[in-house]
Amino acid sequence: MVKAASGYRTSGNAGHRYSTPRHRKKQSAPAWLRHLVVLVVYAGAGVWATWPRFTWLVDGKLPATADVSGFVWNMWWLSHHLGHPGSPFFTSDMAAPTGIHLGFSTLMPLAGWMMAPITLACGPSASFAALTLITPGLLCYVMYRAARLWLNEPGAIVAGAFFGLSSMLLWQDWYHVNIATGSIFLPVTIEAAVRFRRRPHARPAVALGLSIGASVLINQESAVVAAIIATVILVPWLIWGLFTDRALLRQVGTPLMIGAGTGIVVASPELIGAIQAIAAGAAVPPRGVLAANYTQFGVPLPTLFAPSPRLSYLGLGRLASAYSYDNRYEKLEGLPTFGVVLSGMAVLGVASSWRKRSTWAFVALWLVSAALALGTSLTFGNCQISSWRSPGTYWGRTCHQYLPLMAHSYSTRVFVPAGPPAGVWKPVVVSNLMPYTWLVRVPGLAGLREADRFAIAGLIGTAMLAGTAVQWLSKRKWTTPLIVVVIGLGVLEAGWSGAARTSPGYHGVMPTALPRLDHFLSSDHSASIVVDFPYGLRGGVGATGSEFSPAAMLIATQDGHPRAVSYTSWISKVAIAGVAKHAFFRYLYEAERGVILSATDVSRARADLQTIRVGWVLMWRNVWTMHKPRWRYAYIDKYLTAVAFRHVKSACLAAGPLSGCHWNKRVWLYRYEPGAPKKAWREPVPVGSYHQRGQK
């Protein structure tokens, strides 16, 4: 190999040189200070872009969603498990008494371990809130670092802001912090892979392995995307070297092995937990459920480039309505839009730098990710729903779905107006022309069930192109002032402050503690199981039972009692079967569905309770609001009383005295008293019927 000339470095190919001017080193001597200033500015911008989230940290409030309470519980569990033997990827504190595997859940072990000091000092709710506050700044900073590989300082700074402060990512930061935090490692992976291509030594290879391994410990979906990006960056380069530079292949072999080994070692806790979950059946969901998810989360083409709903907070509701975020049929699992400003700047970036090879790499990342985000069909309109979910209700009025090269996937259960209460089984239709249809058929990738999240990877390419446009503007005196205009327009679409109260996406706010109930349960040190009702093993794939109150998992972190409910991304068959073995839970499921129990059923449930350590039941009377909720709650109260529970406490979820509290704003606390005299079971008279699907 020819020795590189002074002032240059090689990548194993003597004819390919990268300049490293010595004067640049002198100018950037205090590089750490510049990076620190950039990071601090980004952190402040992140707090502004998510306002009023910072005030909620002081006020002790959180978004009232099951996902958020699940993240808080995860923080508590990981800090609680530190110093204890056993795997953190299995817990008996959820789905008790059986327990449940967490290998395919949103556990975020790396974030939980890093935030453990705050969790132990201030509590898991404060730790979770702090994580959501620092994530936007980190997203901006890692994007800035990656952009500096190609762009000048102004272009890289703007690219970092467009990425980390986008509504798309900050929506995830509010409600799915695992997605936002996992996205940190996408630009890190790009930076490490490109640095390895430019200088194929052990240091960038180790950085690449650390990035992908750490991503596995945060969010497995992001890790898969990061691995795909690294493969696309490195494999074509290695194949080209196979024919043009064999010495390069000999040079990169050892560093790549070191990097791969580093990634495996870092990710090994999660990988072991995933293997255990696979053995428990957590990775074998019903095919029909996945097929339905594939169609649910595809993004209509206009939505990807629509104005951000953030504009509605600035009085620009007419512009924001193009996205139709407030449509009551919207599947609110994300905010997959690049925005008008960012899309326009990306086009300008292509026009200004179309001769550069890197520009077309960014274009490919943007457009390929956008094509994957479309899902299994090509849809035009201002909604994000699937034709099988609401046939004849909304679809076809403002949304039009096209299925070129249509094919049938697995069958799923469909609920149609005036149809059977149990639904009917119909095949899910997909388009074989869409790339996402083929991606999920690749072995090991079937779990990527939410197509809209691929737009996050496309956001990297879009931000890079926007930064390229800013770089072009910064090189000309007469266009430099336009950068201020670009920043001003970008601010209009940046950030997310939570859904408005009038939006279907508004879930309300919940306090981080309920002292009126906590002291009852905390004073009981028996470690008995608490059953929250409505009851179910909920979350993502394989969920059973009914949705339960988000506050249930929050107060579990206060009293330390195991919970019979669970909230995980994938529910294992072992957990479902283990719960079904217990007559108490089996008949609780049936009573929850409105099935009239017999005296024999109640006797079996009462006998089963004596074999498990259930001590309390919390009846959240604010969850069911439809289909004769008072009769249904009264029926469950009758069942609990018959199996030896006694109502001992009522608390109001709203501010004010209990006497003025509405019935569906209350929580009833029951205590198990096995010595209580038996009550004869009389089958209640059902008051009409209700649709089994509409339990909330």
Model-derived features with residue positions:
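Membrane-embedded helix bundles of polyisoprenyl
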Residues: 42-48, 131-149, 154-241, 255-271, ...
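Periplasmic/ER-lumenal interhelical loops and adjacent helix-loop junctions
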Residues: 65-81, 252, 265-350, 384-443, ...
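Start-transfer (signal-anchor) and selected internal transmembrane alpha helices
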Residues: 1-51, 253-261, 351-366, 481-486, ...
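Extracytoplasmic
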Residues: 286, 351, 488-696
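Active-site lumenal/periplasmic loops and adjacent helix-entry segments of GT-C-fold
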Residues: 53-150, 155-185, 314-330, 398-399, ...
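Transmembrane signal-anchor helices characteristic of membrane glycosylation enzymes that use polyprenol
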Residues: 34-66, 73, 77, 259-278, ...
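Hydrophobic, aromatic-rich transmembrane alpha-helices
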Residues: 235, 338-372, 469-471
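Hydrophobic alpha-helical membrane-interfacial segments at the cytosolic entry of transmembrane helices
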Residues: 34-43, 210, 234, 247-272, ...
